[in-house]
Regions:
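Mid-chain, well-packed structural core segment of small domains
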Residues: 87-103, 108-113
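Short, contiguous alpha-helical
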Residues: 5-64, 104-162
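Helix-adjacent hinge/juxtasegments
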Residues: 58-97
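Absolute protein N-terminus
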Residues: 1-3
Length: 162
């Protein structure tokens, strides 16, 4: 598996692992901290925005649009696997292609597809770390969503997190 494809699969795993922890916490009678939901909403929204930019379509979501837990599940299902497929199925010519787009502040940019796909996963990882902090501050035990943890689970060296 090439690196970008592995990063796409990791991103799905990390989002699903985080959602499972939020679900189990809520099922145990705890409240999902709003700041954690706010930041994780941004993660999911950014995926939708990058997918739209890569496909030349309008994004269905805004950068800081907020979702409740069921909404996060819905948009994760709509975006995470699509991003994984882009990472997995994009050939060398497409990875080298440049796209022009406008960011949320209206600034125009030109970026290579390989850089965008890498950024999308790194951006999500950065913010999942912030979500973990907000979960801990809200009395929940966060998950370890590090890339190496994904690799260890994938190889059977550690058990999946609950």
């Amino acid at each position: 598996m090439n690196t970008i494809a592995k990063l796409g699969a990791f991103n799905v795993w990390a989002n699903e692992t985080l959602l499972r922890r939020l679900d189990s916490s809520v099922a145990a009678g705890k409240t999902a901290p709003q700041p954690a939901l706010h930041i994780f909403s941004h993660v999911i929204n950014a995926q939708a925005i990058w997918i739209a930019r890569l496909s030349g379509t309008a994004s269905p979501l805004k950068v800081w649009q907020e979702h409740d837990l069921p909404g996060l599940h819905h948009w994760h299902e709509q975006t995470s696997d699509r991003l994984r497929l882009l990472c997995e199925q994009t050939d060398e010519a497409e990875l080298a292609r440049h796209i022009q787009y406008t960011n949320s502040q209206g600034d125009a940019f030109d970026s290579q597809v390989s850089d965008i796909l890498t950024h999308a996963v790194m951006h999500a990882s950065y913010h999942r770390g912030q979500v973990a902090t907000k979960m801990r501050e809200g009395g929940l035990e966060p998950v370890n969503s590090d890339f190496i943890t994904y690799c260890r689970e994938l190889s059977g060296q550690v058990n999946p997190q609950q």
